[in-house]
Amino acid sequence: ITALTMEYQVTNTETSEQYQVREAYRLRYTSTRIYLLAYERWTDKILEPGRQLVEDGKLSFGIQSSEPVYMKNTEENVVGFIEQGQLWSYDYGQNRLSRVYGFTDGQDGRADWKEHDFRLLKVDDTGSMDFLLYGYMNRGRYEGRSGVMFCHYDALMNTVEELFFVPSDQSYAAMKEDIGDLAVQNGNGKAWLCWQGNLLQINLDDHSVTILARNVNASDLQVSDSGLLAAWNDEDSGDICLLNTSTGVVSRIEAGDGEVLKTLGFMEEDLIYGAGYSSDIYTDQAGKEMQPLYCVTIRDQAGKDVRQFEYSSKGKYVSGVTIVENRIDLTCVAKASDGSWQEALSEPITYTSETHTNLLKLSTVYDEVHRNEYVLTYGGNIRKGSMKQPNVRLVLYEGSRIVDAGDASVKQYLAYRYDGSAEGFETLTEAVQYA
């Protein structure tokens, strides 16, 4: 049995639109035949910056194999988006499109190798943004190397500056699973990154590294919507550590005697966490440690516990949480007569937040020829005239901005699909079940 992938570009001869096509095959060979066991095909429209990007307030992504990744600023007049291994920014008020970062140069096909990706971290009201670039570096200072690069794009100066680079000897698929949810810089010379189970604090002046915590699993680390707050479990004490990235101060929520606290998530800037008894901790069939929680607390940004929910009186304990918009669903378990834990009905929590009218909305539209296409619709004012396309320059610097992240402190198990993608799991049993 073998698996292979193919990538190529096709052009619509009538409209000159270009598409990136990727095909994956899973084959079995015998002495007389070849069997096709699985086949998938993905098609993505390639952005054409030479054309007017927005018409009638609509930015069309066209045919895409998955939902476009984008981030908008609070005023919703600037949007950053990722397209075919490149990072773009569009300012509706200025009618300005900028290619923030990308390896493709239109001349060398090797620059189109897409074993890398971006993560948008922040877009401010000027259109400037922070972002991560991770994977294999096709060109530039780190050409031929793999790693994670933290960058800042200045929309007013049209420049991109590398803040630091973490080298890696792992594959792109493995690196994608090793980057935690925390990646932020506060504009005052400090940055934070969760990498391979270590919580790193980086001094951007001398690029020294302080490891705030080790053995931090992805399920234990929670980050607020804005990146202002991050919380994780201290497995030694059972406490919760809470980092304010604006000040760099780490505070603690202390567990009581015989108790263990667990982070569950953030609703905007409010932390959701639970408390359980250490004697109730058990290991499930997949070999994963489970911690039933007898109560759940919501703590606001100021550090005040504003709401508390206790379920043990109903015979229920919380085992997990799902957050969708303003609704919190708590997954529950109950203790059976033989002492084992069984699934129980979930408990909902309604969260009240300020109503907000979205100027930017992503939707799908139907077309007779293309079928479903993704469109980003803008409800504000757009500057008329020809679209500006300024050149974004890289900031040159002397010396090195490579940081030493230390050894990995968390073991991950990767399950690979036949198309080359991978999913990371905390236990071997989970990885085998997925595969």
Predicted segment positions?
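Beta-strand C-termini and the immediately following turn/loop, strongest in propeller blades
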Residues: 80-85, 131-139, 151, 181-198, ...
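C-terminal, active-site-flanking charged/polar segments
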Residues: 262-273, 291-306, 319-329
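A short hydrophobic beta-strand element
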Residues: 2-10, 127-133, 271-276, 328-332
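Repeated scaffold domains used in trafficking and secretory/extracellular systems
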Residues: 64-72, 108-124, 169-184, 214-225, ...
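Exposed beta-sheet edge and beta->alpha loop/turn motif
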Residues: 2-33, 40
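Short, surface-exposed charged micro-motifs
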Residues: 24-26, 78-79, 120, 191, ...
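Surface-exposed loop/turn elements that mediate protein-protein interactions on large endomembrane-trafficking
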Residues: 34-61, 86-111, 142-173, 194-214, ...
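Beta-strand-rich domains and repeat architectures in extracellular enzymes and scaffolds
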Residues: 58-85, 389
